[in-house]
Amino acid sequence: MLFVRTKTFGIIAAVMLTVGASQAFAASLEEIKARGTMTVATEDSYKPFEYVENGKPMGLDHELLALLRKEASFKIDQQIIPWTGLLAGVATGKYDVALTAAVITPERVQSLAFTMPIADATQYYVVRADESRIKGVADLAGKSVGVQSGGASYAALADLEPTLAKTGGKLGKVVQYTSLPEAYQDLANGRLDYVINGVVNLVSLTKDQPKRFRMGEAVGAPTYAAWAVAKGNDGLLAYLDTFMAKVRASGELYALQEKWLGRAFKDMPATATK
């Protein structure tokens, strides 16, 4: 894990690759069909969207992948990898699709194109169940926070910082993690004051461990999660959007949301690109 005390978050886009690089190396839908294989990358520890349990891939995205395989005329090769490098791998063409619930951010759309959203991904904070100092967003001022390196929780700090400033507060120590389960462990052990993550993930966490964690309020603007391809790969994006529209219309997506996320997000927009 990486420890940093952060003062400003205006230039997060620097970690992403250029649009030109994305367009230069990404395989088109025609090329994928010609070679007979599409390579997708999914995360290894992103419950309830993607995770591995007893050696078996689990989660909402894995069930959506099973539906996509039934529709596809080509083989789909799934690579289960850590979060770090996943989106960059798609931007450079190493993988064709980030088949992960990637939160759509202004920085990411510089090098990636996103499908129809698959879930709400508004960022919230979570604290220990017995935490008495933090009752609202304003109380986060000066407190240590855990976020995922390069993830949407890190990007949410750009919204939280000015919110705290309105009441004279500032961000405290920011600790970045490769995966958020590490952050939850540090939170439980008192090494952090709060952790930021998407609403779905935190609902799952607090439902599974109500005696350890308590969910707080939203720390950023409404956001959504979707699959991603390299920016400019319009044919592949259209193919995936057609699939997404079909599973929405059939109700299969909403049934999977109920199963894995605890609720159906039927009011999601057709597009949520910022």
Across the structure, where does each feature detected by a protein language model lie?
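Acidic, polar ligand-binding/catalytic clefts
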Residues: 66, 70, 75-138, 213, ...
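Alpha-to-beta junction loops
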Residues: 38-39, 73-75, 91-100, 143-144, ...
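Periplasmic-binding protein-like
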Residues: 44, 120-127, 203-245, 261-274
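Extracytoplasmic small-molecule ligand-binding "clamshell" domains
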Residues: 27-101, 240, 250
